[in-house]
Each structure stands twice: as structure tokens, then as C-alpha cells.
Design a protein with these regions (language model features):
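Non-catalytic alpha/beta scaffold blocks inside enzyme catalytic domains
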Residues: 1-133, 155-285
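N-terminal, charge-rich interaction modules
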Residues: 39, 110, 140-151
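A short amphipathic beta-strand at an alpha->beta junction
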Residues: 136-138
Length: 285
């Protein structure tokens, strides 16, 4: 809940509750830097806004990494539309922090370079950790997005783009991710669970979804259900089904159901599908 008014009645909050041990002034003790291709609402709240040219993420990360490594002489006058002096100032702020955190959005994966842009960011964070403490957290939308990555990492050792078709786990982003497989028209059947590919995947991949056997497990009607051959309504975890959700920072949270409905959960549907597949395979032997 976010409020614009807070009343303290019968209590002196400042003297009763302790402030942060390391950042007693809260927001005033923190420096927020926003990097984006345009001035967003978040950028207006930042202390420093760096406007980068579209597709310049990879170059920007590597320029900052070079500065952190002490290679200032090799930096050109501008990198991805950002002046050299701004890069030096930013690097000095990053190095001067006692504890810093990077938050990356899905925009990094939408430009040329895709996952390599994220890797460049991780390498910059790794370089900064040689001097001080830094973390990196991906910011993604929707409910429990991190849950799938956690389960894939646990079962296969990789967070996404996992291919089992070879009989062993194969991981190669750019070849085995959902977008790549659909773009190359390799898939003739797709099972979509709790997400909306129709709203977020490229147009040509969504067009392919409409041509093949697409099945959607979702509590709601979406752009994916519009192109699907079959839509199976399911219960919504946290409302009429219980389960485990992973917070943005990877912390698992068990959620209880608020009420009981007649809708089956994702787990129930997938279990029944798995049982039927095993039954069919046994009959074919």
C-alpha cells in the first residue's frame, strides 16, 4: 500500500523506532542513477539521469567497466551518446559507494545483443565487487516471474531456454529460447502457463502461435487465449489456490488461498496431463 499521508498518534516515531545503521537519512543518503533511452517518470526522480542511445547498453557497460579497471585513456569522447566526463563521474560514484545495487529491466534484452547486454552488466558488477560490494537484481513484470527461473535452475542448472530434446539438458540462448524456436517455426505445439506471450512476444512469433496447436493455462482471457486452440481456465494462486511464489529477490513465499472455487490449479492440470502422457506411452510399448 502506498499512501501520501501518514499520521503518528500517541507516539514519537523518530525516537521510538531506530533509523538505519548505515543510512540514517534514508533517501537523502542514497544516490539514484537511471540509464534509459528517454526521460521516464523514474528518471525524473533520480539524482542522475543518463540518456543512452537505443542499442548502446553493451557499449556503455563495457566503457564503465574499462574505467573501473583503470583504463580511462581508451575511452572515446562519447560512448552510446554519453559524454566521456559523465562516464568518469558515474564510475567514480559507483566506486565510492559502500554498497550498491543494479536493477536491470527487460529493455536490455530487446535491443541488439539481447542476453549479452545483461552479461556485460553482470561483468561490470563483478568488476565493481573487486573494490566494494554490489548486487544485481533483474526487474521483471507479472506475478512470480522468478519462480520459473528458480525451478529450472534447481532441476536443470540453467534459468531458462532449457532444451531436453537431445535426451540431455542443452542450454543455448539465441537458439533454444521460446522466441528463437517460434521465430524459426520449429515448434508445432506450445503449452503456455500463466503468462501472456501474445502481449509480449514479437509479432511474427505470435502469428506462428495462431497457426499451431497452442494451449493456454490461465485464469484470465488474454491475447494468448485469443490465438490459442484451447484455453483451460485454472485457479489463481493466492486467491483460490495455495502454492509457493518467489519474490523479486528470489525469496520463496508460501501463499494460502483466500477462498475455495471449482477451478483446478495449474499443478492439478499438469499432473493429469503427465499421467495421461505416461499412460499413452505405456500403451504404445
Amino acid at each position: 500500500m502506498i499512501v501520501d499521508c501518514c499520521q503518528c498518534i500517541g507516539i514519537t516515531k523518530v525516537s521510538t523506532y531506530s533509523t538505519g545503521a548505515f543510512r540514517p537519512e534514508g533517501r537523502n543518503d542514497r544516490t539514484v542513477i537511471v540509464v534509459d533511452i528517454r526521460e521516464s517518470e523514474t528518471a525524473k526522480l533520480a539524482d542522475i539521469f543518463i540518456q543512452v542511445k537505443p542499442g548502446g547498453d553493451y557499449a556503455l557497460f563495457n566503457a564503465l567497466r574499462a574505467i573501473v579497471r583503470g583504463e580511462r585513456d581508451i575511452i572515446p569522447d562519447t560512448v552510446a551518446g554519453v559524454e566521456r566526463s559523465v562516464l568518469f563521474k558515474t564510475a567514480d560514484i559507483l566506486l565510492g559507494a559502500k554498497f550498491g545495487s543494479f536493477f536491470t529491466g527487460i529493455g536490455l534484452t530487446q535491443s541488439r545483443g539481447k542476453y549479452k547486454n545483461v552479461r556485460a552488466g553482470i561483468e561490470l558488477v563483478d568488476e565493481l565487487n573487486r573494490h566494494t560490494k554490489y548486487t544485481l537484481t533483474p526487474l521483471r513484470g507479472h506475478w512470480n516471474v522468478d519462480g520459473t527461473n528458480q525451478m529450472f535452475s534447481l532441476a536443470a542448472g540453467y534459468p531458462y531456454a532449457v532444451d531436453y530434446s537431445r535426451g540431455i539438458v542443452h542450454y543455448n540462448p539465441g537458439e533454444t529460447s521460446g522466441v528463437d524456436i517460434l521465430a524459426k517455426h520449429e515448434a508445432d505445439a506450445v503449452l503456455i502457463i500463466g503468462t501472456d506471450l501474445g502481449a509480449h512476444f514479437p509479432r511474427e512469433t505470435v502469428a506462428h502461435l495462431a497457426k499451431i496447436n497452442t494451449i493456454v493455462l490461465d485464469p484470465f482471457i488474454s491475447l494468448s487465449t485469443a490465438v490459442a486452440k484451447l484455453h483451460i481456465p485454472v485457479a489463481s494462486v493466492g486467491l483460490d489456490a495455495e502454492g509457493t511464489a518467489y519474490r523479486l529477490d528470489g525469496v520463496p513465499i508460501h501463499v494460502k488461498k483466500a477462498f475455495t472455487s471449482s477451478m483446478p490449479s495449474d499443478e492439478e492440470i499438469l499432473t493429469r496431463i503427465l499421467q495421461e502422457i505416461r499412460k499413452i506411452k505405456a500403451e504404445r510399448k
